[in-house]
Regions:
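Alpha-helical secondary-structure segments
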Residues: 35-38, 85, 113-114, 132, ...
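N-terminal lobe/hinge region of extracytoplasmic solute-binding protein
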Residues: 37-83
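Gly/Pro-rich hinge or "lid" segments in bacterial periplasmic/extracellular proteins
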Residues: 63-110, 114, 124, 227, ...
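Ligand/substrate-recognition segments at binding pockets and active sites
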Residues: 93, 234-296
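Structural transition elements
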Residues: 199, 203-235, 248-255
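Acidic-aromatic pocket-rim loops
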Residues: 278-326
Length: 384
């Protein structure tokens, strides 16, 4: 009897301890302004106005996803601005935007009353504002993710869904020489780009789709082959030179371009890297340029067909869409056909990285094709 009493007493004590440690449940709350900081400068929310660079194009699409009712499978937006979860209440071109919650949104009103977006903030200032509690959500460069986490910040990292690639410009020598294209492709040390430039926050890319999406990325080599690159380049007469363009406003592209130049020159390739003020076009001297391609869908067929549409004739004569029920083998064969031309040279896959403030609740890292998850985020009044 005493043993039963002792066991009961012990059980009761454990229950009381557990109850004392239990935290009160947190329920979603409406209200507040979500403070967001980004590096891009968006001059106009109008989708008809072209973006000056890839960073502005991405931010513009993210904002549009909050303003329109929904996004179609092909990535276009449906409805009119303001039919989505938010509407524009203030817009200072290139500096600041305030989006107010749409009370009549068919998907339900967002939890926050508004989203304030500060544009053109430097990477350093974004991290500092997160630490000081002046920002709730801020973009973090992939190469800064590990350092931010070590400093105790909440860091959200998505699946790698943005491809950084070298794209050869049609009609410009030596881009029209297949040996030159292959030589450059084989000279690049992708692992070094991931390990040293990206600080291991990314993946080497040999194909146009990531492993988590297609399941066949491992079939594409990502290893450098400097001897083969040197042999290919030696076959080309006339000592051609490749000019590799990159976005002048993108420090990551600059670092990658400079690394490619080092690798290529070690293989005897004549190459130089030059900054372009307008990433939307390539100067006549550029034979190749760095390009960012973001997946519009986690599904391999949809993502690959979007890349084909964006790249156009660069990928080759066959730009016809794959059937909706295309088998994995068919998707792989089309991908292999494009990569084997060396007109598009995949380099690395990049994730979306965000730093989160203490007030932010219910954040979910966006999947490929998804926009900023501000509709479902709510703010804790007194975070612990």
């Amino acid at each position: 009897m005493s043993r039963r009493l002792a066991a009961t007493s012990l059980l009761l004590a454990l229950v009381l301890v557990a109850a004392g440690r239990a935290q009160p449940s947190r329920r979603p709350k409406y209200g507040g302004t979500l403070r967001v900081e980004i590096g891009a400068v968006v001059n106009s929310p109008d989708l008809a106005v072209s973006a000056a660079n890839s960073n502005e194009a991405f931010a513009k699409n993210e904002i549009a996803a909050l303003l329109y009712d929904h996004r179609n499978p092909d990535g276009t937006f449906a409805g009119v601005p303001g039919s989505g979860p938010f509407r524009i209440s203030e817009w200072e071109p290139g500096k600041r935007a305030v989006l107010a919650a749409n009370e009549n949104y068919r998907g339900g009103r967002p939890f926050v009353d508004s989203v304030e977006i500060q544009m053109g903030r430097s990477a350093r200032d974004r991290l500092l504002d997160l630490e000081l509690g002046k920002a709730d959500v801020a973009e973090i460069l992939p190469e800064e993710a590990r350092r931010a986490s070590e400093r105790g910040m909440r860091v959200s990292t998505s699946e790698p869904d943005e491809l950084l690639a070298v794209v050869f410009v049609s009609g410009r020598p030596p881009a029209e020489d297949a040996r030159a294209r292959e030589a450059l492709a084989r000279s690049i040390d992708r692992a070094a780009i991931v390990n040293f430039i990206l600080q291991k926050e990314g993946e080497p890319a040999g194909g146009l789709l990531p492993q988590w999406s297609s399941g066949t990325a491992f079939l594409f080599s990502t290893s450098p082959d400097a001897p083969a690159a040197k042999d290919l380049w030696a076959q080309i007469g006339g000592s051609p030179k490749i000019v590799l363009g990159y976005d002048a406003s993108d420090p990551l592209e600059q670092s990658v371009a400079e690394r490619i130049v080092v690798n290529a020159r070690e293989a005897g390739i004549a190459i130089s890297a030059e900054a372009n003020a307008n990433a939307a076009s390539s100067p006549a001297k550029d034979g190749a340029r760095l390009m960012r391609l973001r997946m519009i869908s986690p599904y391999p067929r949809e993502a690959l067909m979007d890349f084909v549409a964006v790249l156009g004739p660069i990928v080759g004569p066959d730009t016809s869409p794959l059937q909706e029920n295309a088998a994995a083998q068919q998707i792989y064969e089309r991908e292999r056909e494009i990569v084997s031309s060396y007109r598009v040279v995949p380099l690395v896959w990049l994730p979306q990285v965000y730093g989160l403030g203490a007030r932010v609740r219910n954040w979910k890292a966006p999947a490929a094709g998804e926009g900023w998850p501000f509709t479902d985020v709510w703010l804790e009044e007194n975070p612990q």
